[in-house]
Regions:
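Extracellular glycoside hydrolase catalytic/binding regions
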Residues: 64-79, 146-154, 158-167, 171-300, ...
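Short amphipathic alpha-helices and their capping/turn segments at secondary-structure boundaries
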Residues: 37-41, 85-90, 117-119, 213-216, ...
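N-terminal carbohydrate-binding accessory modules
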Residues: 20, 27-96, 341
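Secretory targeting and sorting signals
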Residues: 1-34
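Short acidic-hydrophobic catalytic motif
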Residues: 142
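Short, function-defining helix-loop hinge/capping sites that tune catalysis or transport
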Residues: 106-108, 139, 177, 271
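Short linear capping/connector segments at secondary-structure termini
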Residues: 133-138, 169-173
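Aromatic-lined substrate-binding rim segments of carbohydrate-active enzymes
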Residues: 81-136, 147-149, 190-196, 279-297
Length: 344
């Protein structure tokens, strides 16, 4: 059973059908200019973001396609759709978006179009985190195919090494590896891509990216950012905000200055009041604790998801047709808590 089956149903909603990728390959993009490191890299607290996800939870054997986009669209249409959706995220107060990649989406024909989403986001001034998801027919917490994974990252980094707003997360939730195995893989990735400034690399925590301490402690990964995940459904009987805060802090240790909580979320379509008393709701306790902790420790944060069709956790719902798209907020109190976390 998937660790994330709570997130809703696949292929629900109008704008994105389940799709199948088609074969073929594009020439690799020309090598980008050498990476330009900002004089002062932004602190993690400047990452105020949302995930933009495929209705299938980003696990796909074919191309992974964020909600509202289509593999049948060219670059210009993808850019226009993405400009509208990123504009909606900006209106929420976000300045960061996390997007999924997989070998089919990058090594195949969709990449030429998908770059429109990345480019629209960076043109808006957004930081973009590109993270690898394994296929839905694997889901063993391991890289599906080393050669295609390497080729994917070579293509992505050659395209975006020169754009300091693009960040790279080698793998989402590497739960199939021991801590030592995962840090070995991560260290090899960092060394292979040493032309990328380390502050532009997010290394997921151990297991379900749920504990950053082993990664933080590895000297080979010094200077990288750390990606943490935590969800309220992991402890459905916890209704104490303080208990949740302690749980968050136990996963971070003394590594807060490097940590971006790039997945956290709860139900946004069920009418919960995240500003109100906790009562018997583990979700309210969890969201209040998460946002308190983000604010207190100065963590980066990327809500799951800002948009995913058919997901009860989705902060927004996509409206419109064609490239005339907009977002409506599903739960204002949930957004209020994000604004509190983001000091807005």
């Amino acid at each position: 059973v998937s660790h994330k089956t709570h997130r809703g149903t696949a292929c629900v909603g109008a704008l994105l059908a389940c799709v199948t990728a088609f074969g073929g390959a594009l020439a690799s993009p020309a090598a980008a200019s050498p990476a330009h490191r900002p004089a002062t890299p932004p602190p993690v607290s400047d990452f105020k973001g949302v995930n933009w996800a495929d209705p299938r939870d980003n696990y796909a054997d074919d191309a992974v396609v964020p909600s509202g986009l289509s593999i049948s669209d060219g670059y210009a249409t993808t850019y226009a759709k993405s400009k509208a959706i990123i504009g909606g995220f900006s209106e929420l107060g976000a300045n960061t978006v996390r997007l999924p990649v997989n070998p089919t989406s990058v090594n195949g024909p969709f990449w030429k179009s998908y770059r429109g989403a990345i480019d629209a986001a960076t043109a808006k001034g957004f930081k973009v985190i590109l993270g690898y998801w394994e296929a839905d027919n694997a889901k063993d917490g391991k890289i599906d195919d080393q050669a295609s994974w390497d080729r994917m990252w070579a293509r992505i980094t050659s395209a975006y090494a020169g754009n300091p707003k693009v960040y790279f997360e080698p793998m989402n939730e590497p739960f199939g590896y021991t801590a030592q195995e995962w840090t070995d893989i991560a260290a090899k990735w960092v060394n292979t891509h040493r032309f990328i400034a380390r502050d532009r690399i997010l290394i997921g925590g151990y297991k379900y990216s749920e504990d950053v301490k082993p990664v933080c402690a590895d000297p080979r990964l010094k200077g990288t950012r750390l990606a943490l995940h935590n969800y309220g459904f992991w402890h459905t009987d916890w209704t104490s905000v303080d208990q949740w805060k302690a749980d968050f802090k136990s996963r971070i240790g003394d590594c807060a200055s490097r940590t971006i909580l790039d997945e956290f979320g709860a139900s946004m379509t069920t009418g919960l009041d995240y500003n109100g008393p906790v009562g018997t709701s583990n979700e309210i306790a969890y969201i209040q604790a998460a946002t308190d902790t983000i604010r207190e420790l100065g963590l980066g944060s990327v809500y799951w998801p800002g948009l995913r069709n058919g997901d009860t956790y989705s902060l927004t719902t996509l409206q419109g047709t064609g490239t005339n798209l907009s977002l409506t907020v599903n739960n204002q109190s949930g957004l209020d808590r994000l604004h509190y976390a983001w000091k807005q």
